[in-house]
Amino acid sequence: SPSLDDERNDNFVRL
Protein backbone atom coordinates (compact mmCIF):
# COMPACT_ATOMS: atom_id res chain seq x y z
CA SER A 1 0.00 0.00 0.00
CA PRO A 2 2.01 2.99 -1.26
CA SER A 3 -0.56 5.61 -0.26
CA LEU A 4 -2.61 6.00 2.94
CA ASP A 5 -5.81 5.76 0.92
CA ASP A 6 -4.69 2.39 -0.43
CA GLU A 7 -3.98 1.14 3.09
CA ARG A 8 -7.46 2.13 4.22
CA ASN A 9 -8.92 0.45 1.17
CA ASP A 10 -7.02 -2.75 2.00
CA ASN A 11 -8.39 -2.70 5.54
CA PHE A 12 -11.92 -2.21 4.26
CA VAL A 13 -11.55 -5.04 1.74
CA ARG A 14 -10.22 -7.36 4.46
CA LEU A 15 -13.41 -6.99 6.49
Curated annotation (Swiss-Prot):
GO cellular component, one term: extracellular region
Protein name: Extended FMRFamide-12
Main location: secreted
GO biological process: neuropeptide signaling pathway
Lineage: Eukaryota, Metazoa, Ecdysozoa, Arthropoda, Hexapoda
Keyword Kinase assigned: no
Function: FMRFamides and FMRFamide-like peptides are neuropeptides.
Location(s) in or outside the cell: Secreted
Family note: Belongs to the FARP (FMRF amide related peptide) family.
Originating species: Namaquaphasma ookiepense
Keywords on record: Neuropeptide, Secreted
Keyword Ligase recorded: no
